[in-house]
Amino acid sequence: QQRVAREHAIVEHIFSHAIVNEDEILTYFDHHLAPAETFNGDVFICKPSPSGGLYFLVGDFTGHGLASAIGALPVTRAFQEMTAKGLAVSELALELNNVLLRFLPADMFMAAVIGEIGADGKRLTLWQGGMPEMLLVSENGDVRRLNAKHMALGILESQEFNSDSDTLTMRHGDQLVCYTDGLMEVTNDKKEMLG
């Protein structure tokens, strides 16, 4: 019992130091991670781009618990290295797919949204694979639904993988809403799913 608790504490320490978002960058995002267990497969990473914009990744690994969370370590490291180089979103998607193919067992993958907001705050470049639809909500409440067009990361080999990204124009006051399937699986007091 004590050994398991100690091992969990060690792993939690490693995760808390490996997946760190800069406070200055986090001010541009409202985010909430509420794992059902101590460890889970949901990940949110945001980094500045060399051109003055912002990169972000919202990911959801298959499974639950520590086994699903472990994939976040190579993804975080690769994301940090590639965003520091200013790679395009499509290149990020391709490289993260390759990282996951190398590191994960064949039955694991990561649904993900990878995005870059341009320095002007207007250009939004997105790659979506295996995630629930995103919502682009205008200042006056109009909602544009953005559906994933690709398979999740870590499934297809490079020659089959589609890294095409979409570029959208955002207006002042627009909000981008992204969530994992965990939100749709939340239940009310009657055990009815809300999603």
Regions found by a protein language model. Give the residues of each.
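Short, intrinsically disordered, charge-balanced linker/junction segments flanking boundaries
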Residues: 190-195
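… and, occasionally, acidic/histidine-rich disordered N-termini of signaling adaptors
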Residues: 2-177
